[in-house]
Amino acid sequence: MIHKRFSIFKYLISIVISLPFLYGGDNTLKDYVNRSDTTFSYNERHTYSKDNYTVHVLEVFSQTWKSADVVDRAHWQHWVNIIVPDTLKYEKALVLISGGSNGDSPPSSVDDEIVSLALMSNSVVIEVKMIPNEPVVFSDETFKRSEDAIIAYTWDKYLRTGDADWPLQLPMVKGVVKSMDAVQDFFRSILNDGNAVNEFVLLGASKRGWTTWLTGAIDDRVVAIIPVVFDALNLVDSFNHHYGAYGFWSPAVGDYEAAGIFDWFPRPEIYDLMKIVDPLNYKDDLMMPKFLIHSAGDEFFVPSSQFYFDKLDGPKYQRYVANTGHGMDDKLADVIISAVAFYRAILNDYTLPEFSWEVVEDGSIRFETVTEPKSVRIWTATNEDEFDFRYYTMGPIWKDSLLTESESGVYIANISEPLSGYSAFFIEASYNSVYPYYYTFSTDVSFLPKQLPHAATISFQVMGVSGNEGAFSIQGDMTSQMIRELFDDGQHDDQEAGDGLWALTLKNVIDGEYKYNVILHENDTMVKQNDVPLSFLVQNGHVSGTTSYLIGSVGTINEGVVENFNLSPAYPNPFNPRTTFKYSVKTQNHVSVNIYDINGNWINTIVNKMQHPGHYEAQWDGSGLSSGIYFITMVSGDFIQSQKALLLK
């Protein structure tokens, strides 16, 4: 048994089967932002002085995105307000990323709240407007789009074409980066003060909060970020949680539903998009201090920090604001106090509070603080009918009460599971800062009962054959057609290590019908084990159908399939940059041949058509890819086979 487990371990190490969504980097965004663009320019439209401060208004042309043949607003323009207090003390500046409509005249004034930020902080405050440029009309449409409607349109174009310049997040980030470039050049070249602004702290809300994350990930000048009401990192899991809670897509995300974006969730292409737009994909570049501000009643997002906050590294803080919607409503002034306190801490290198928390298996929250708090509170909300805590549907349902220490520095929040419906709760702690400011931070939100009404936690199990030296995985709709490894280590609902029972638990499998295959990995090949796709149904959170599979005789099951259909090893192998492979088709059928990387991520489609019986040959060009192990996978009807290919550059 020890020898068997060691052999399996060696095999798994050799092919490195892993989760489909690893939080590594992707260069698409950075390459787009750094791409030379002669459109970039700026000019000073006017300057005016008031008591204690001066405002410079720049007109910045950041880029050409797409072309006039594709969209009526190809050349992006931004109004940039620079507020310089007379008592300037810092070389860090706060960048407020905001919206605005195309065609607006140069700003003649700045909001009093923005001016106050500059005066209170004694730092430069920069407002970058028109992120994104909107509204726009695309050439294949006759109506205007704004905000999420533009994003949804561009995502659909990317998913259908693979054109990496489509996602709107790319020009949104570049608009901010080039505006920061313009501000620094303006201080250096026009004001002859090259040291006025050397570093930036970014703050943006909603789509601009999204942009805050992504800009911070690719620009080294950013030393801290304050993203507001964008509670959707690890986006696919977060939105599966969203649907699992409601059983429908909230109207707030209706633009994405109308564009069919959620229909891509069972397909591998969605993860290629996530590599570009999901901030968690850039976690290694987000080590700077972070203060995340969320609405506990956001109509766009179900509280979702549990899917990503613990994966973030570096100084990190968050706050859920009770009894608010996406716009923060009447709590906006309090939110500004929290943001300013954090910003002043960054400016002055103040020591921020030290604390930690854990959501325990029973749903309770354990909060431990090293720094003495002003107060610690529990916020609770109950909906006796359904899982819905949206402010615009439920109103101010959150209630708070003080928590007392269970032991020194330890606070426990625990509530009873409701007799009907759902409850939610979180801990909020306030800490002193330099008067009159204070810090307010919170934990993740815990929900009871833990099982969502429209999603299920499912344990998939495969019982192997005695003496089998291979490993098993599953691939299907619930894995977005990505290969997911099963385990025989005694830690994944598989009872004992090495007992031949392979298992994997998937959370938040939302209502719907699913098909999948069981795959054996052995001798560097992947062979489907089931003659017909396995299937199951999730309905109102209940599961019916096949979620476990008993392997009878692996060789007998697949002997006929391999004889009739075949994918031969690639030659040359290793290769650079091209290799050729042959395959055989016995009966007329649809054939697809796809390339996957070592993590199971879809790379490219080589063949995707109906083919007659016969022998075929195809070539794969790996130009543009990094060296590594890739899998060539052929699917025709119920047949699936893979061959490993090594690209060496």
Where are the language model's segments positioned?
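C-terminal tail/sorting-segment detector
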Residues: Q619, S623-K649
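Short beta-strand/loop motif that positions the catalytic acidic residue
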Residues: L286, L292-H294
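Surface beta-strand/loop "capping" patches
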Residues: A341-T380, G395-V410, P453-A455
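The feature marks proteins involved in alpha-glucan
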Residues: N432-N468, T505-I557
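Glycine-centered coil/turn sites that cap beta-strands in beta-rich domains
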Residues: I557-Y571, F575-I595, E617-W620
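Hydrolase active-site cap/lid region
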Residues: L214-D263, R319-N323, M328-D334
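Aromatic-rich carbohydrate-binding modules that target alpha-glucans
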Residues: E386-Y411, G467-D511, H521-F536
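Cap/lid segment of the alpha/beta-hydrolase catalytic domain
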Residues: S101-D104, S123-V177, A232-Y246
